[in-house]
Amino acid sequence: SAPSASLNIVFSRVWGKAFAEKFEQRHGTPFIIRDLPIGPEATDEFLTDIAQRFGLDAKPLIERENRIFYGYFGRSADAFCDQDLKFYAITVTNSNYAIPLAKFVTRELGWIVTDSFVTDKLTDEQKEALSGEYPLQFKTGVQEIARAINKNHPNSRGQRYFDDITPLYIIGSTLEKQTAISRGARHLSVSFPVYDRLITDKGYAGYRGGLHLFEDLVGQIMSVKG
């Protein structure tokens, strides 16, 4: 049962802490706050932390999962080795996904995240909890976000010398799809609301979740390249 747990893990820097604190006060169960791990590097760090807390050896599990992930990753590279996979990325997600997604895209794929938008309505204290690793922009409206993207990265108007961010990938919700189309960018819906793709039993957390995300991102690129 829940009161017998040895540790509670809150996968959010802004949501769930109050509940975990009350649970600790009532049942004596400590808690930690961690970002949702996506992909091997983040999941390695997470499992190592948890294993050390309980005197366990996570190394065999980590090594096995890394072999699986990078095995698929390496074999998949043969299918698109002639593609340009050095992308710029803009993320538009809720507060729980913003930092984990940016970590995965930069660390595992080597892409450059130019903008990370957080769509939650947050207090100043909650915004501060998210600060530090990546520069975040807090905007809640679809048009507000679209204007910010176009202002930060205006399209070329035929200038000979133009610092353009291409190829560009917008990773957000279905609401950003039109903005992506208008800029000739790739797009993948991963954050609420999603109504341009069917998701029944797929998540992006952990090792296998990282593979799912890699598959979805690169699948979009290959479908466009044809």
Q: What positions do the PLM features span?
A:
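An N-terminal assembly and electron-transfer interface module characteristic of large anaerobic redox
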Residues: 1-226
